[in-house]
Structure formats: C-alpha cells, structure tokens
C-alpha cells in the first residue's frame, strides 16, 4: 500500500518545498523504492497554461500533454518517474470537476459544500495520482495560513486519519532567519508556523528548517521541544552552491532513515553515487563557455527554469562551466547586436506575442551571418525561419500570422489540424480558447540522416514534448528549401516541420519542440550536449 508524505511550507513562500521534496524522493528512490510526486496548487486557474510567465514562471509540459507547475520539472529532474496529468491539479480544476458532477446530478440533489464535496475530490485526486507507488510525496502549494490552501490542508488532515499514522506523515518547511546584529538564528517564526498548523489539526512529523546559516544543535533541540517533533526529525537545510547537493545533505542527517522506519518499509541503503558524480562535475569543470540567451521574460528567470537547468546539465556532461549571458530581446531591438559580441554560442528560447520578436530575428541574423553556433527552441525556430525568408529568400515582409495577419509571406501560421501521439486528429481555429488548445505533449519526430540534429541524437526517430499553436507554413516551404534551408526533422506523420538547419554553418539547429523538458542532471540531453560542444569548438577558433 502507498505511503504518503505531505509537504507544506510556512513563514514565507519560495523556501524550496519542491526541491526539498524532490531530494527526499531521490534518496528514497536510491533505496530501491517506487516513488512518485504530486503538486497541489491552490490558485483558481484550471492550469497555468494561460498565466503570465512574469507571475507564474515556466509552464512545465508533461509527457502526456499537461500544462503544469514548474515544480514538476524539478520532480522529473530528481527522480526517474515520469509525471503525468494526474500529478498536478489546482483549486480551479477541483471546482470544475465538482460542478460538472453537480450538473450531471451525481450528488442527488445535495447542497454542494467545501466539506465534504471539495475535500473528497481533492482526496480522490491524491489517491489517483499516487497510483501504486511505495511512497507518494504530496506538495501543497502556498504557505500555511493562506486562505486559498485551507481546503487542501483539511483534505490531507482527513486523509491522514483515513489511511492511518503508519501510512501518512507530514513534512513542514519553515524559515529560521539569521539576525546579523544579534549573531544568531531565530526559532520563533518556526514555532508560530507549527502552531498555525496544529490549530487546524495537523501535527508535523518532520521539520525542514531553511536558513542561510547552519542551525546549531541547541536551536534544533529548542525547535523540537516547542513543536512536539522528534529532535532527529528537525533537519537543518542551509543554502548550498548547487541544488544537486541537497539529496546528500538530507541523507547525511538521516531523513530517509526516519521515513523508512516510520513507515515500516523494507529496503536497502541509499546509493547516492550518481548524485556525487553530478556534484563533482558541476563544481569542478575543466572548460568554460559563454552562451547568450536572448528571451522575452528576463525579468523572471523562472520563466526559463527547465532551459537554464538543461544548459547546466549539458555543462555537467561536458565538464564545462556554462556561463549564460541573459539578454532581453527588446534590448537587441533598441541597442543592437553589439550585446552579442564575444559569446561562444546563442540560444533563443520560446515565447508568445509580438513584443521583442524583432530583436530575436536580429539575433538569428547575427548568429547565421557570423557563423556562431545557434540553438532555437519553439519560437526560436519560428524566428529562424522568418529571418531566413527575409534575408536569404528576399521576402522582406515575411512573418508569422501570430504577429502580422496581413503579411504576404506568412512563413509561420496557425496549426489548424494535426495528429496527436494517440493517433487522434486535433483541430483548432483562430476562435478557439487559448487554454488547453495547443499542440501539447510528447510527439514522434523523424530525423534526417547526416544532419547536425541526427548526429546529436544518434537515431532516426526521437520523442520530444511540444507546446505551441503555430508551425512552419508548408505552402511556402518549397521556396525556403530551394534557397538552402534544410528541413532535418519532421513530425511522425511527416506533415509538420520540426527541425531546420542553416546551410554553410558550423552549427545552426532550430527545433519546434522543447528538449529542455526531458533533460536531467544525471543523463543530460543530447541536443544541449551537442550545442555546448559546438560552443567549445567556436571558442577554440578564437584562440
């Protein structure tokens, strides 16, 4: 039977519940247990798909096409379990399902209330998402005390009672601030946070105390005394220079032993040698490159969380320190491509909307004409096609219909019909809702032998995840290929352009899919590794 570890946060937000949860999951997985993770988001949006990147950060896309919280990206990077639609849900999704059932008459005329109807739906989704895992870690978004999270906290209170103490435990993350003028850490915020939890019937079993300074034994003993938590279950988690150290930090304090003993699980010891290798390669690079990342959402780098991590993973795989130079594409528009001088490669990620697009197009032109390694992702591929159409083919008004409906040369247009991974035909129009209407999730892609992208993957057919509603216009493709543009990747049915490469260029690859969603610190990703290798080769030319 599945055991549940519910994870909450207190005092302040952004303590790193997702990282701490994923790190514990990684240790339990290293002990031979089958582990999964869930993220419960208290906001009323049905999913984060239409939320601003400046507010929410990245939308992580699962293999089965769910638009989810960025924490699911952390989960997949730390454990081998692939996340799905069942691993993330919101208040909006819960209410939507309950109201749909009410309209069908499923509740037989009952008055619909938060308790029991909303809490029952939350519990049902938790149990479904956990599946047949040995241990399911369930992270509750937000901070204890927020009004939005109350139904979720009540649901896990009920579920703990229903499954019993031997199958459920609560891990609470808190902040233990260091007061420089006093020269000591303060435990009072943690005490009050636990008091808030206990007032709603939740007693934490584990406290993970975040701080920028070590928390000494006396402070941990004091926290244990005032919170009714075992002293060995008060874990000190101070800031580290790489998040991939955290599994080792938690293991060294015996957190996994405490969990295994509490649940009565029979399993081996934790083999964290893979994580030791990751940390060693991350902290002891032998080479160094500088790569410009030109995007639209540079004010909040969480909008590119998986991509930034994927570049770090590529550095780990190549024993290379990857310095990312973050450049806003609007700055390229206003200040010119001089901002790109001196870099070893250029990366243009995805995005939506007209703002900053011309800066991205200028960036592509600079990379293509100066023979600088280029990787374009999603919109980064679309602007590569637009740039080629304008400056090589000669269609000066070439554009995407997303940005200019009146263009006489719409080389990128709305996908009106495509076949999903299950073989079903999906159809969209300009009048379709924005939410949940994109080409989403894992799709097959056929690669052309002898191409740069084929050299990276070393296979003819790959599977990558998508999140887009615009594609290369096949009606204008013949003129583009006649002018030299190489189409080196197509969708499984051959209908859609997935990868393009520029001719007479050392390394210019642009893909419609999002390879960053499947990159992990232990395995890296072949496309990003190839990109970093190209950057190293470019740097060697300068010497």
Curated annotation (Swiss-Prot):
<dbReference type="Pfam" id="PF06418">
    <property type="entry name" value="CTP_synth_N"/>
</dbReference>
<feature type="active site" description="Nucleophile; for glutamine hydrolysis">
    <location>
        <position position="378"/>
    </location>
</feature>
<feature type="binding site">
    <location>
        <begin position="186"/>
        <end position="191"/>
    </location>
    <ligand>
        <name>CTP</name>
    </ligand>
</feature>
<dbReference type="GO" id="GO:0042802">
    <property type="term" value="F:identical protein binding"/>
</dbReference>
<keyword id="KW-0315">Glutamine amidotransferase</keyword>
<feature type="binding site">
    <location>
        <position position="13"/>
    </location>
    <ligand>
        <name>CTP</name>
    </ligand>
</feature>
<feature type="binding site">
    <location>
        <begin position="186"/>
        <end position="191"/>
    </location>
    <ligand>
        <name>UTP</name>
    </ligand>
</feature>
<feature type="binding site">
    <location>
        <position position="13"/>
    </location>
    <ligand>
        <name>UTP</name>
    </ligand>
</feature>
<dbReference type="InterPro" id="IPR033828">
    <property type="entry name" value="GATase1_CTP_Synthase"/>
</dbReference>
<feature type="domain" description="Glutamine amidotransferase type-1">
    <location>
        <begin position="290"/>
        <end position="541"/>
    </location>
</feature>
<dbReference type="GO" id="GO:0003883">
    <property type="term" value="F:CTP synthase activity"/>
</dbReference>
<feature type="binding site">
    <location>
        <position position="222"/>
    </location>
    <ligand>
        <name>CTP</name>
    </ligand>
</feature>
<dbReference type="Pfam" id="PF00117">
    <property type="entry name" value="GATase"/>
</dbReference>
<comment type="pathway">
    <text>Pyrimidine metabolism; CTP biosynthesis via de novo pathway; CTP from UDP: step 2/2.</text>
</comment>
<feature type="binding site">
    <location>
        <position position="351"/>
    </location>
    <ligand>
        <name>L-glutamine</name>
    </ligand>
</feature>
<feature type="binding site">
    <location>
        <position position="469"/>
    </location>
    <ligand>
        <name>L-glutamine</name>
    </ligand>
</feature>
<dbReference type="InterPro" id="IPR029062">
    <property type="entry name" value="Class_I_gatase-like"/>
</dbReference>
<dbReference type="InterPro" id="IPR027417">
    <property type="entry name" value="P-loop_NTPase"/>
</dbReference>
<dbReference type="InterPro" id="IPR017926">
    <property type="entry name" value="GATASE"/>
</dbReference>
<keyword id="KW-0436">Ligase</keyword>
<feature type="binding site">
    <location>
        <position position="71"/>
    </location>
    <ligand>
        <name>Mg(2+)</name>
    </ligand>
</feature>
<dbReference type="GO" id="GO:0005829">
    <property type="term" value="C:cytosol"/>
</dbReference>
<feature type="active site">
    <location>
        <position position="514"/>
    </location>
</feature>
<feature type="binding site">
    <location>
        <begin position="146"/>
        <end position="148"/>
    </location>
    <ligand>
        <name>CTP</name>
    </ligand>
</feature>
<feature type="binding site">
    <location>
        <position position="71"/>
    </location>
    <ligand>
        <name>ATP</name>
    </ligand>
</feature>
<keyword id="KW-0479">Metal-binding</keyword>
<dbReference type="GO" id="GO:0005524">
    <property type="term" value="F:ATP binding"/>
</dbReference>
<keyword id="KW-0067">ATP-binding</keyword>
<protein>
    <recommendedName>
        <fullName>CTP synthase</fullName>
        <ecNumber>6.3.4.2</ecNumber>
    </recommendedName>
</protein>
<feature type="binding site">
    <location>
        <position position="139"/>
    </location>
    <ligand>
        <name>Mg(2+)</name>
    </ligand>
</feature>
<keyword id="KW-0547">Nucleotide-binding</keyword>
<keyword id="KW-0665">Pyrimidine biosynthesis</keyword>
<feature type="active site">
    <location>
        <position position="516"/>
    </location>
</feature>
<feature type="binding site">
    <location>
        <begin position="14"/>
        <end position="19"/>
    </location>
    <ligand>
        <name>ATP</name>
    </ligand>
</feature>
<dbReference type="GO" id="GO:0019856">
    <property type="term" value="P:pyrimidine nucleobase biosynthetic process"/>
</dbReference>
<dbReference type="InterPro" id="IPR004468">
    <property type="entry name" value="CTP_synthase"/>
</dbReference>
<feature type="binding site">
    <location>
        <position position="222"/>
    </location>
    <ligand>
        <name>UTP</name>
    </ligand>
</feature>
<comment type="function">
    <text>Catalyzes the ATP-dependent amination of UTP to CTP with either L-glutamine or ammonia as the source of nitrogen. Regulates intracellular CTP levels through interactions with the four ribonucleotide triphosphates.</text>
</comment>
<comment type="similarity">
    <text>Belongs to the CTP synthase family.</text>
</comment>
<feature type="region of interest" description="Amidoligase domain">
    <location>
        <begin position="1"/>
        <end position="265"/>
    </location>
</feature>
<dbReference type="GO" id="GO:0046872">
    <property type="term" value="F:metal ion binding"/>
</dbReference>
<comment type="subunit">
    <text>Homotetramer.</text>
</comment>
